[in-house]
């Protein structure tokens, strides 16, 4: 029986819209969604609400949780925080290990968090590009083996590319723009990509794709 894996990137982030936010932020490497990012997340939810998704996994960074939460509300599903979907822990992007909100704080703001779920893969800072590729491929393969229903992964530009390549193999170009959708259909080690960074559900898209 074939499985569908949906892979989405978070919506627009506040520091992309207001770069000065970084200078005074308490957690500068964990920006929230921008105002238009929330609109994108809602549009993503509208796009996916008729799909037969059984599980939603998201990176523990705030922007991915906020994006996934919009989808989870429309699909009436819990959120599983999976560190294997985290941002690339690139020391050129982050001078120190990024601080994210604790589960206790997140629970106060996101009632759909599945507190019984623990991450299957946990990255370490700093992380090379090779380690990123291995980590994201491993979490994608781990999740499709453990959860055989249709699933949604919500991550970052780097983890959208890495999880996709981890399943389809090779080195395909992935259009990992903000709030894009990748759709993979297959089983075991035989996957094909039906959508590559689709943004047809968005009312507004970025003019140039950036990861950081």
Where are the language model's segments positioned?
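Generic beta-sheet signal
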Residues: 5, 147-157
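Active-site-proximal alpha-helix that buttresses catalytic centers in soluble enzyme cores
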Residues: 2-81
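Glycine-rich phosphate-binding loop signature in dinucleotide/nucleotide-binding domains
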Residues: 50-52, 143-149
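Short, active-site-adjacent cap segments at secondary-structure transitions
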Residues: 14, 64-65, 87-89, 159-161
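Phosphate-handling substructures
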Residues: 31-32, 75-134, 194-196, 206, ...
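Alpha-helical packing segments of well-folded alpha/beta enzyme cores
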Residues: 40-44, 64-67, 128, 132-143
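Acidic, low-complexity terminal tails and accessory targeting/binding regions
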Residues: 1-2, 80, 87-102, 149, ...
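Short, well-ordered beta-to-alpha junction loops that form the rim of enzyme active sites
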Residues: 58-61, 82-85, 154-158, 197
């Amino acid at each position: 029986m074939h499985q569908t894996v949906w892979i989405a990137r978070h919506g627009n982030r506040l520091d992309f819209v207001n770069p000065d936010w970084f200078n005074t932020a308490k957690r500068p490497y964990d920006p929230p969604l921008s105002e238009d990012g929330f609109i994108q997340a809602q549009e993503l939810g509208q796009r996916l609400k008729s799909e037969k998704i059984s599980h939603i996994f998201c990176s523990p960074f705030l922007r991915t949780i906020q994006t996934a939460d919009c989808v989870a509300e429309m699909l009436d599903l819990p959120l599983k925080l999976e560190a294997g979907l985290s941002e690339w822990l690139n020391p050129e992007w982050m001078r120190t290990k990024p601080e994210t909100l604790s589960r206790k704080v997140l629970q106060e703001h996101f009632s759909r968090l599945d507190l019984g779920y623990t991450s299957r893969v946990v990255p370490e800072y700093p992380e090379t590009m090779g380690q990123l590729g291995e980590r994201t491929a491993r979490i994608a393969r781990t999740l499709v083996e453990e959860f055989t229903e249709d699933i949604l992964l919500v991550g970052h530009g780097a983890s959208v590319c890495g999880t996709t390549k981890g399943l389809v193999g090779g080195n395909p170009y992935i259009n990992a723009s903000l709030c894009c959708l990748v759709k993979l259909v297959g089983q075991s080690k035989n996957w094909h990509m039906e959508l590559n960074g689709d943004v047809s559900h968005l009312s507004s898209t970025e003019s140039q794709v950036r990861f950081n």
